[in-house]
Amino acid sequence: MADYITTNIRNIALIGHGSEGKTTLTEAMLYAAGLVDRQGRVEDGTTMTDFDPEETRRKCSISAATAPVDWNGKIINVVDVPGYFDFVGEMIGPLRVVETAVIVVDAVGGLSVGAEKAWDYAGAHGLGRMFIINQMDRDHADFDKISSQLRAKYGNCVVPILLPLGKGPTFRGVVNVLDRKAYEGAYKKSVEVPMPENMKGQLMECYSYLIEQAAAADEELMEKYFETGELTFEEIKAGFRKGMKDGSIVPVVAVSAATGVGIARMLDLMAKYFPSPAHNGLYWAGKDPRTGEDITRICKDDQPFSAFVYKTIADPFVGKLSLFRIFSGMLSGQTTLYNPGKDKTEKCGGIYILRGKKQVVKESLHAGDIGAMAKLQYTSTGDTLCDPANPVIYPPIEYPKPCISKAVYAAKQGEEDKVFSGLQRLMEEDPSVTLSKDPETMETLLSGQGEMHLDVIRSKLASKFGANCVLKDPKIPYRETIRKTVKVQGRHKKQTGGHGQFGDVWIEFSPVTDGSTDIVFEDAVVGGVVPRNFIPSVEKGLRECMVHGVLAGYPMVSVKAKLYDGSYHPVDSSEMAFKTAARIAYKKGCADANPVLLEPIMHVEVIVSDDYMGDVMGDMNKRRGRIIGMEQCEGGQKIIAEAPLSEMFKYATDLRSMTQAWGRFTMTFERYEEVPADVAKKVIASADKVVDDDE
């Protein structure tokens, strides 16, 4: 593989909605460049970037994969990113290491929620953008309609650059607005042809869009354009390059990844006009780990080395691969690597370029390039590697919070260590997955971005590490309390031949009404009817019992127990006897005090477009939720509601289905409320009640 200096590097991420042809587009680019003998198909499991067995089985991308494409003396580092929202974590990392986001849009369906979110993510990372209207060979493909939709949505920055010749089955070539030439044919067989008469009007209209935006990208060009109404071809190209870099020009191109039409001309645009890492200047901002001061690094070979690890591949057979982007300096096998976040020095175990799963050995890489290193001992995704003499640390990747959790158990008893060590390895690959221990239920929770996401983790655990796990809905941390005041005696008497056991207490159980969930104990004994040294045993017995309620074994809350009377035996009374008497009083008293079941109520905020308001609100009502209010917000309407946790476990998946993936939500604990009688009956019937033996 050739050696490419910084100015000849182009780093791009293919992003957008799922099933709109990003992986097929990557294959077409590789085939056009002569890097594969035949173009793979997602349906057949033969693509270079969908190499994971899970991707082959599911016929969709679930991990970001790189595919460097050599084209006209440039290297285009393509990062093929999954489009489904369950795998959004795989998009966040690559966007940190590219200059341009290429958003793929379907030529029939048009702008999708995945494309809109991709636009927002790219903008948040300050990237240049381009739209590819793919699948122009399909029936009902309509470039004019989709490009007009994009201009209406995002403004005049959107400029059609490659116009289609024909559409649907007759799509045979493209018109390049920039050089005002027409081309027919697929892949490298794309050749110049005379400009069709019926395209000249559309060409000049789009050319005028291009001139205006090229002029707007540069103040000097704008002044000349206002004065003369013209720009030279070289000036237009310069304005186009600058507009691509700062986002003031967003080209739109027509291609068919399946047939290869438009692919070569699209690659020409990327090679000629996409920004290289050198164009970003003082772009990479970090901090000095020793002082906390801000540091910038210029993406040049003569700068101190620094790199950012954006992805990790954990393989049980070949070990760990760390995928990185060089932000400054050069990397060779002799480069000393320092991880400032871990304060560790790493030994480079080999430098590679990855094309799918294929590893190409490299002696060195230039500033701005993307590569991989093997067997880094301490380094994880989001870490910085740098020159130890010139340390810098870049901001870590901020992954979206998990929106679904499942309790995870080993499928076979005794394999717990195998399961959880495997999950830890998979979390190195995918930091958007988390493991946590619920202190209430003591379950281990596996959390991620959706049901498919967690199912993929479960499948990978089995295929990669031979560990099988079971995923279940988490237990609900119900509570129990009482609604009325009762007075009850707890009397424990047992004669066994020697010293007996005797304890006698009268306790008043009442609800706590000040909003506190505490268990309150009050000593109201007078006259020594219960000796002072036994009163702590009564309190201890009550508190131990109240860990398990009388209805379904859930902890009691908001209960006051007042010890106000009792009796004792000078010989047979003991701490244990009074502790047992307190337990008897608790069971008798709370059972008669109108015990009720409480459930956690969550504060939920859902953001949706106006089109889906009715469906979302109706669904919330079906979940026993209450709509508290609505607010106008960026991106649509915010619905504020409260709903029981038990009804919200699959809400992330259901909301995506209801809103065509437009909706998003946040959820936090609010308070406990009484469970409706019909629901409580089912919970109590299915609960594993704790059986206490008073003996």
Where are these regions (language model features)?
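Structural and coupling elements of P-loop NTPases
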Residues: 1-695
